[in-house]
Amino acid sequence: MSTGKIIQVIGAVIDVEFARDNTPKVYDALNVVEAGLVLEVQQQIGDGVVRTIAMGSSDGLRRGMEVKNTNAPISVPVGHGTLGRIMNVLGEPIDEAGPIEYTEKRSIHQAPPAYDELALSTEILETGIKVVDLICPFAKGGKVGLFGGAGVGKTVTMMELINNIAKEHSGYSVFAGVGERTREGNDFYYEMKDSNVLDKVSLVYGQMNEPPGNRLRVALSGLTIAEGFRDEKRDVLMFIDNIYRYTLAGTEVSALLGRMPSAVGYQPTLAAEMGALQERITSTKTGSITSVQAVYVPADDLTDPSPATTFSHLDATIVLSRQIAELGIYPAVDPLDSTSRQLDPLVVGQDHYETARAVQKVLQRYKELKDIIAILGMDELSDEDKKIVDRARKIQRFLSQPFHVAEVFTGNPGKFVSLKDTVASFKAIVNGEYDHLPEQAFYMVGSIQEAIEKAKTL
């Protein structure tokens, strides 16, 4: 184990000097013995000097401190011992529940599976959320992005997905909290505990208050745990909240590492860093990883380089819209902007496909008529258009749904709606079978039967 000494500290970036014939490799983990801090090598500058990123606070470091090379990358425990536990980026427990029992530790830097190991799947993963199952169905082993600005419900929608999938499919999940609020991480832990699904979830947190090195690597730590379950012939769910903060952490250290910034100040290696993470989230012949990633959209601008780079890796995109949230419709999913590769007659069947497209057609027509209604009022519309507007408003309200995880705020018990019921209900609304019901009856209900019951009380 070779030793070196710190020669420069600039925020999270630390230069360490070793003997020239003992220079650490890129991605090796180094230990600052006195401070109990782990550094990860990013660059070899020459003359035995390496540039590293600190995986914790660099407060109190000084030049000349001794640093030991572990001769290995950062490794985290994998397997059943991680279930129900909260870990940090280094795989150390932070839930005060004793040490983690494990038989194997893996490096957080792994090569993606080889081409001949990959497996394709067209199986649909039922989520119980109407708008998702109808408009942007998930593929087992696919990647899903939840796009939205600040405060439109990304984290709540993600918590509902974890809750539903853990209860209905009893699969293992890994949750990587990347640069999100510590309060949300805390709420999430107790939410899982109360729902009795904590023993099926591994939690890896590197929250907002952590230094950038921590946030840059915590997604990889979570992914390594998910890969461990996948290699045990399991179907795993990987949740990342929030993938934008992973990019942002890279941006924070990029300039300090001496790289020229690219568009909007992002790191020039943005696409490569994103690819290194996303290419590992995939299904092999042994098991599958289905991933759901929350993507913060800066200033609601989907063309920003960070969300734009993420888009290219996804199979389905769920776009949360502020305009829909303002109407009080939650989940605030935009049915015209959200897409899925699985929405194909060969995958979901002709009936589902036609219903989804009919719903989108009605909503698109309503969107076009909105300007006319705003200027001239409803009376100037043809009878056919009046019908479309009426149905569109019902569809819009019926796309809302009470969530289990939001029960404490709303007082409405959460609803899980099967895919069969969802398709049949929307087909009936589009065909005009419920034209006689008031639109308020469709708001915040589960199945169409509940809407009929609610209409009797209005």
From Swiss-Prot:
The keyword Cell inner membrane applies. SMART domains: AAA. It catalyses: ATP + H2O + 4 H(+)(in) = ADP + phosphate + 5 H(+)(out). Transmembrane segments: none annotated. Coiled coil: none annotated. It is an enzyme of class 7 (translocase). GO terms for molecular function: ATP binding; ATP hydrolysis activity; proton-transporting ATP synthase activity, rotational mechanism. Its EC number is 7.1.2.2. InterPro entries: AAA+_ATPase, ATP-synt_VA_C, ATP_synth_F1_bsu, ATPase_a/bsu_AS, ATPase_alpha/beta_chains, ATPase_F1/V1/A1_a/bsu_N, ATPase_F1/V1/A1_a/bsu_N_sf, ATPase_F1/V1/A1_a/bsu_nucl-bd. Signal peptide: none annotated. Keywords: ATP synthesis, ATP-binding, Cell inner membrane, Cell membrane, CF(1), Hydrogen ion transport, Ion transport, Membrane, Nucleotide-binding, Translocase, Transport. It is found in: Cell inner membrane. The keyword Nucleotide-binding applies. Gene3D superfamilies: 2.40.10.170, Bovine Mitochondrial F1-atpase, Atp Synthase Beta Chain, Chain D, domain 3, P-loop containing nucleotide triphosphate hydrolases. One of its GO terms (cellular component) is plasma membrane. ATP binds at G148, G149, A150, G151, V152, G153, K154, T155. It is a peripheral membrane protein. Belongs to the ATPase alpha/beta chains family. Produces ATP from ADP in the presence of a proton gradient across the membrane. The catalytic sites are hosted primarily by the beta subunits. F-type ATPases have 2 components, CF(1) - the catalytic core - and CF(0) - the membrane proton channel. CF(1) has five subunits: alpha(3), beta(3), gamma(1), delta(1), epsilon(1). CF(0) has three main subunits: a(1), b(2) and c(9-12). The alpha and beta chains form an alternating ring which encloses part of the gamma chain. CF(1) is attached to CF(0) by a central stalk formed by the gamma and epsilon chains, while a peripheral stalk is formed by the delta and b chains. This is ATP synthase subunit beta. It comes from Francisella tularensis subsp. tularensis (strain SCHU S4 / Schu 4). The lineage of its organism: Bacteria, Pseudomonadati, Pseudomonadota, Gammaproteobacteria, Thiotrichales. The gene is atpD.
